[in-house]
């Protein structure tokens, strides 16, 4: 009886949504310009907070008679395809038949778009209906007309309501017939597993009433193929017009399964089904040799134990196999949360099922989960999250550990509650091992879940995963992942680079070169102290002793360079010069003199700043030089760091030597003032 309560609450919420969206329902849209054929509009803005805010809203607006108090004129040639979508697409009225339909709704990239079916003239109303794929997806298959006494061509057999047009009639059968909805609410044993659930009916489990109801539904709809992409969601359970019509009359033992549709995930469901049209069949869980499909629907037409038109979730498969301890279809409502937030809607349908099961379910050592992207069994989708894939890998690595625990059936015929032959398929917790739920819900032996997620398989690489995290996959505590030996994985993962990972700084703590002596002392350079200005300038009288600390980092190497033993500069490293060997501004010279004479000392620049801008022969770009200390840099980022670390508060300590920048940085030709010296240098190149 809980199912009916859930559905009543959902329909009450939808009724409130209808009251809030009266403007959307009673507004017609007219175009102010001609629309060519195959013009595309969209995407349509849908929040998926209710049934009326999903892709089913077009069918829910369909009526025989229109009351249009609002007319909305739209310039369809305006900007299209914005990130927010087109708001007026929600206001387009539903077409009543194919003759007046001029727009077709279809799914692309998980979003709803409209396509013009013909040329639409100016000042013509836009009327939309679903395309062929969405019609099959929403189970809005056209039924044959039921004529009663030569009156209306379309009559509902449940409530005897008559319709003049096809599309409102189909929408009524699918969504709005009160007797159908009431029968769904009043028939809870179709969803409970205590007795003869819908998916647990055996060979003779049905009754005369169920057979009559099935025959009545077969009379309502023609023989058409069953829905390919019907997803049994945990929220809405609505009867379709022809769910079992494709089944032959010989399968009268199976009950009348009312397929249900999760309208919030239909868009991504359709997109997934296009990519993987061929379904991967898992080991059989039903009777005989009829196996269910792991990532798609259970096959229609299976007479014994088949869930016609419904998707088998991992919980349901375990309930039939005897070992999860969940009664029938109740696993859907108890274990799977309602998809309400937008974050939950981003998951793929396969991932939505796998994430909904909070415990792993194995059968003969195979995990009932969507094929992992690491093994190549499924294509990578834009909605797949690496964490979820890592969870599937973590569950697979312990599949062998829980194989012999007794919680899973060893073969399809040995399970206690497996539906087979003509027996009823009721599954109880006593059918399997008593400790099966505890073993399935127990913590995994391979360490904590965050550890497994962090260690993960080195084969998977996310653009947002740090390299160090990927590198730890081979050694920590995550041995036995689905990749191979740990050593090779570590070597392979160390070579991989991520575009979004923060690289290790090539300059150790950004201070590779340290001045050995103070700027004012100017002591002579000893032979073992590395490179001094005497080697660079033989005529220098007072050289600046410079000590190299980790100078190999400038070369790209890893080990530090020894300062003793007559060590010289490595190849391709920047040469070092004392600031006394090139001219500086008078303000800087006065500051240097004051620093040498008094206690006030300037911040010593690092050796990277001791490069003149004129040495272009050293492959140093001239534009990356500091205008305050004449230091040149290979990269602009180094110059930016230098300016922030050395010259941020430099002039705050020397108020006596400040000069106005307008006087100091002025073009001698055109007298234009500049704030920075390199701006003046660029300006001077224009005069050449």
Curated annotation (Swiss-Prot):
Quaternary data: Interacts with BHLHE22. Interacts with EPM2A and NHLRC1. This interaction sequesters EPM2A and NHLRC1 to the nucleus.
Record EC number: 2.1.1.-
An annotated Gene Ontology molecular function: zinc ion binding
A biological process from GO: methylation
Pfam families: PRDM2_PR, zf-C2H2_4
Sites where the protein binds S-adenosyl-L-methionine: 130
Native species: Mus musculus (Mouse)
Gene name linked to the record: Prdm8
Gene3D superfamilies noted in UniProt: Classic Zinc Finger, SET domain
Keywords annotated in UniProt: DNA-binding, Metal-binding, Methyltransferase, Neurogenesis, Nucleus, Repeat, S-adenosyl-L-methionine, Transcription, Transcription regulation, Transferase, Zinc, Zinc-finger
Name assigned to this protein: PR domain zinc finger protein 8
């Amino acid at each position: 009886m809980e199912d009916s309560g859930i559905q009543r609450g959902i329909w009450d919420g939808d009724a409130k949504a209808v009251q809030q969206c009266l403007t959307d329902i009673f507004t017609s849209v007219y175009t102010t310009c001609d629309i060519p054929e195959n013009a595309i509009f969209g995407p349509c803005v849908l929040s998926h907070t209710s049934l009326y805010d999903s892709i089913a809203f077009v069918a829910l607006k369909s009526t025989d008679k229109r009351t249009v108090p609002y007319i909305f004129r739209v310039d369809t040639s305006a900007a299209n395809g914005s990130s927010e979508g087109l708001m007026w697409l929600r206001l387009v009225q539903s077409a009543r038949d194919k003759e007046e339909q001029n727009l077709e709704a279809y799914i692309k990239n998980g979003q709803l778009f409209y396509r013009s079916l013909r040329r639409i003239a100016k000042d013509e109303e836009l009327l939309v209906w679903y395309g062929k794929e969405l019609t099959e997806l929403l189970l809005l298959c056209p039924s044959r007309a039921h004529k009663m006494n030569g009156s209306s061509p379309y009559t509902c057999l449940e409530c005897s309501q008559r319709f003049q047009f096809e599309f409102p009639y189909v929408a009524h059968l699918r969504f709005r017939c009160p007797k159908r909805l009431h029968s769904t609410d009043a028939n809870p044993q179709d969803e409970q597993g205590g007795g003869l659930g819908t998916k647990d009916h055996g060979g003779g489990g049905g009754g005369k009433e169920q057979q009559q109801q099935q025959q009545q539904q077969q009379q309502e709809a023609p023989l058409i193929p069953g829905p390919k992409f019907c997803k049994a969601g945990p929220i809405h359970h609505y009867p379709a017009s022809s769910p079992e019509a494709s089944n032959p009359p010989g399968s009268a033992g199976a009950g009348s399964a009312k397929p249900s549709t999760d309208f919030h995930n239909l868009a991504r469901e359709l997109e997934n089904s296009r990519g993987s049209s061929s379904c991967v069949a898992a080991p059989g869980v039903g009777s005989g040799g009829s196996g269910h499909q792991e990532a798609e629907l259970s096959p229609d037409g299976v007479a014994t134990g088949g869930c016609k038109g419904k998707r088998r979730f991992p919980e349901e498969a375990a309930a039939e196999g005897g070992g999860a301890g969940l009664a029938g279809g109740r696993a859907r409502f108890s274990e799977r949360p309602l998809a309400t937030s937008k974050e939950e809607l981003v998951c793929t349908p396969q991932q939505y099922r796998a994430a909904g099961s909070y415990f792993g379910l194995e059968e003969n050592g195979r995990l009932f989960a969507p094929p992992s992207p690491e093994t190549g069994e499924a294509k990578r989708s834009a909605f797949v999250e690496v964490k979820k894939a890592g969870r599937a890998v973590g569950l697979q690595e312990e599949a062998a550990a829980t194989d012999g625990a007794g919680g899973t059936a060893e073969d399809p015929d040995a399970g206690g509650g497996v539906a087979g032959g003509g027996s009823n398929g009721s599954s109880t917790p006593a059918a399997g091992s008593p400790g099966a739920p505890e073993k399935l819900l127990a913590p995994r032996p391979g360490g904590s879940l965050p550890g497994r997620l962090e260690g993960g398989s080195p084969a998977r690489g996310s653009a947002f995963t740090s390299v160090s995290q990927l590198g730890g996959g081979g050694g920590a505590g995550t041995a036995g992942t689905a990749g191979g030996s740990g050593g090779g994985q570590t070597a392979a993962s160390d070579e991989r680079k991520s575009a979004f990972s923060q690289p290790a700084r090539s300059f150790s703590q950004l201070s590779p070169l340290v001045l050995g002596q103070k700027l004012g002392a100017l002591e002579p350079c000893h032979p073992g102290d590395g490179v001094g200005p005497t080697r660079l300038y033989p005529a220098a009288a007072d050289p600046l002793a410079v000590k190299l600390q980790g100078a190999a980092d400038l070369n790209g190497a890893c080990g530090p360079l020894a300062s003793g033993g007559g060590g010289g500069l490595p190849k391709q490293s920047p040469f070092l010069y004392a600031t006394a060997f090139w001219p500086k501004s008078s303000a800087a010279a006065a500051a240097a003199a004051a620093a040498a004479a008094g206690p006030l000392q300037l911040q010593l620049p690092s050796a990277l700043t001791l490069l003149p801008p004129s040495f272009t022969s050293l492959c140093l770009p001239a534009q990356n030089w500091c205008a305050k200390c004449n230091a040149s840099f290979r990269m602009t980022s180094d110059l930016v760091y230098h300016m922030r670390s050395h010259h941020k508060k430099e002039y705050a300590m020397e108020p006596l030597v400040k000069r106005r920048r307008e006087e100091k940085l002025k073009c001698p030709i055109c007298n234009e003032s500049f704030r920075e010296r390199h701006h003046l240098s660029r300006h001077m190149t224009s005069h050449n």
